[in-house]
Amino acid sequence: MADKKLDTQLVNAGRSKKYTLGAVNSVIQRASSLVFDSVEAKKHATRNRANGELFYGRRGTLTHFSLQQAMCELEGGAGCVLFPCGAAAVANSILAFIEQGDHVLMTNTAYEPSQDFCSKILSKLGVTTSWFDPLIGADIVKHLQPNTKIVFLESPGSITMEVHDVPAIVAAVRSVVPDAIIMIDNTWAAGVLFKALDFGIDVSIQAATKYLVGHSDAMIGTAVCNARCWEQLRENAYLMGQMVDADTAYITSRGLRTLGVRLRQHHESSLKVAEWLAEHPQVARVNHPALPGSKGHEFWKRDFTGSSGLFSFVLKKKLNNEELANYLDNFSLFSMAYSWGGYESLILANQPEHIAAIRPQGEIDFSGTLIRLHIGLEDVDDLIADLDVGFARIV
């Protein structure tokens, strides 16, 4: 299927007859105990328990295997581990490869829980973490240490949406610490708009809760990795008891079938909104990777095949508490909620000092209130009209 276009891959990935048993979709196989017909069958399952053979519920069922196979086909990986959420995927992927005395190098624009895991959990295990600017490129060599075991990327960055120069970073890391494991939180690109493993990254992690599920009604994380990382990542996750239920795996597989159509609409609508915002007199700047002038836009243009629905913009004005509540409380189409990636449009706000507080170096370069949008599948003109009315509330 690698020679087929993305939409064709998304429709067909993981849908072998072994997993569908004659239906269109993979079967939902809920099981803890899986029965062996004979002693020899038990021995066979035991020998092949890590290679897609039915063995025990914690190793997975046909439903899980179908999704894992699909993710490997889509991201070009040797294996895929499923986790109960994106944060679990990040934490357990890191844990699989570090030990006392190691060093983790993480972008300072990583998702806040990813940063907290390093600073609050890994620090107790004798693992140090330091941070790098997302636009550092080849200069990342200045932050590498002999004991650097993991380099963790997130592109675009959380909230402020900076795009890494991934080829420059990967080349620099390989030249200094060639055995380091390079990971990326690839959620924004849904694992398909940026093919991380093709760029030399070892582990591509997603909160599949977002675009893969696509309907804001299930939580799941994925980690797709290359051959050198697969066994260690797989076995660590198994020993840590990481798994998802069959129904969630099924919902995620079903979400893949419409992912291409949804992503195109997210791209088209979010870029139209971003372009409109860029011309608005109350907006200081727009952080959208596909918009010229956004930080790292040139790397997005070179390395990505599209964009999704999440971006942010900065107001020229810093809203006080009353103004902010009046602004956020009165939208008709934008809801306030954490997460994103569903069919619905969402809005949240951050004050500059709050963003500075969750950045390791505390550095930000704006003074107005930041607004984060997820542009859903509603008519884009209706969304722009709702935003336009919102601006009238904060004049």
Outline where the language-model segments fall.
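Conserved PLP-enzyme active-site core in the AAT-like
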Residues: A2, L10-Y19, C80-H280, N287, ...
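C-terminal core of ALDH-fold dehydrogenases
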Residues: D3, L10-V27, E323-P360
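Short hydrophobic/aromatic beta-strand micro-patches
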Residues: V224, S312-V314, H374-G376
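Conserved small-domain helix->loop->beta segment predominantly found in fold-type I
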Residues: L271-S332, M336-G341, I355-G362
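N-terminal "arm"/small-domain region of PLP-dependent enzymes with the aminotransferase-like
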Residues: M1-T61, Q69, I371
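Glycine-centered tight turns that cap/initiate beta-strands
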Residues: G76, N147, Q282-R285, L333, ...
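PLP-dependent enzyme catalytic core of the Aspartate aminotransferase-like
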Residues: S119-K120, T128-S130, K149, R262, ...
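Conserved N-terminal alpha-helix of the aminotransferase class I/II PLP-enzyme fold
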Residues: S38-A88, P113-K120
